[in-house]
Swiss-Prot record:
Record CDD domains: GT2_GlmU_N_bac, LbH_GlmU_C
Protein name from the UniProt record: Bifunctional protein GlmU
UniProt organism field: Aliivibrio fischeri (strain ATCC 700601 / ES114)
Enzyme class: transferase
Catalytic-site annotation from UniProt: 360
Catalytic activity line of the entry: alpha-D-glucosamine 1-phosphate + acetyl-CoA = N-acetyl-alpha-D-glucosamine 1-phosphate + CoA + H(+); N-acetyl-alpha-D-glucosamine 1-phosphate + UTP + H(+) = UDP-N-acetyl-alpha-D-glucosamine + diphosphate
Family: In the N-terminal section; belongs to the N-acetylglucosamine-1-phosphate uridyltransferase family.
InterPro entries membership: Bifunctional_GlmU, GlmU-like, GlmU_C_LbH, Hexapep, Hexapep_transf_CS, MobA-like_NTP_Trfase, Nucleotide-diphossugar_trans, Trimer_LpxA-like_sf
Cofactor(s) needed for function: Mg(2+)
Residues given in the record as acetyl-CoA binding sites: 377, 383-384, 402, 420, 437
Keyword Cell wall biogenesis/degradation: yes
EC numbers for this chain: 2.7.7.23, 2.3.1.157
Gene transcribed to yield this protein: glmU
Amino acid sequence: MNFSAVILAAGKGTRMYSNKPKVLHTLAGKPMAKHVIDTCEGLGAQNIHLVYGHGGDQMKAELGEERVQWVLQAEQLGTGHAVNQAAPEFADDEKVLVLYGDVPLISAETVENLLDAQPTGGIALLTVVLDNPMGYGRIIRRNGPVIAIVEQKDATEEQKLIKEINTGVMVATGGDLKRWLAALKNENAQGEYYLTDIIAAAHDEGRAVEAVHPVSPIEVEGVNDRAQLARLERAYQAAQAQKLLEQGVMLRDPSRFDLRGTLQCGMDIEIDANVIIEGNVTLGDNVIIGAGCVLKDCEIDDNTVIRPYSVIEGATVGEECTVGPFTRLRPGAELCNDAHVGNFVEVKNVRLGEGSKANHLTYLGDAEIGKRVNVGAGVITCNYDGANKFKTIIGDDVFVGSDSQLIAPVTVANGATVGAGSTVTKDVNENELYISRAKERRIANWQRPTKK
């Protein structure tokens, strides 16, 4: 579909009480403006013009300078003035869609309906009927067709009774839009150039104005404060949870589940309460995710159990594995099939071989660990000397006793045993027992020191 979009995002967001531009506050882990940009890109917008004012450098850094055409509105003189800043870039014959960076839930389906509804030479306008329309511009109709929009502060008492309101989202042809914008005046209670005044201008020229309703009213709710943002967050999460339930995912408590990215699921998935999904996550068949887990940019294969309060980021977990509770898998962690990682174990940039176990109180970093290895409680791979990181290599069928330290770079060969409490500074040979302990001393009749 041949269209360009203008996203208005110049507001300061005073009621957010934040140094951050309002449209950079996140919904589902993503800036509000990015939701709108993604929707436009998904529909194939030819150009996306983002009108900004406050915090431009920060917005460009977070949203990406290359994704949109940045248009500065140095003074905030109204919505019509904002769109007019981008008007020189409009092609005369293209559809121009006006959206808002603080209205993040607008759906592709609603936008498509609006674009399709634009009459030739006219305007398609997104409206909604509210029980309490206070504060919104009212839709004025004459015998059915829309003829104007009147803002709350300019409305008569009779007009204030109208419940159909303007969402601000509209489509017009570029050439017409440029002409109407150039003719706007600021003779109103706000002293601003209202975009809504182009509706009356179109009507005066005999152009049709078509009103379209969104698929869901929540799509056109804007954000002016943190309470409204929290409301939209919950609405978004409820919708995501409902989709997953319909796809066969068992969410034990849909109201306590957050999807802040994308989730691909196999069959018979169970997800307990207070689980957060971030980035791109893939779950195989028969995966169980315990309560309070955070999964980010990871892949978990079939028949694996992630026990409660585990944090997994940038990791891959094989089939038939058990992780947690209270495990942290950091980027580069790879658990092969039937691996077990237990409570208070941290794994970073490690390949843990098939059938290997680290069940308690362990740090494994920058290591290659073979098959059927048992790593005892309190074991640490000492991978960092304060300046550089080094690798630990552990072969197959190795037993590393509790409270041992492996000082990298070091290799423990196949079948070796490291006795509990050892500090390993040199390579251990195959099938060798390595013990490194201080000499035991016993002092009979020992007298403890007393305070003086």
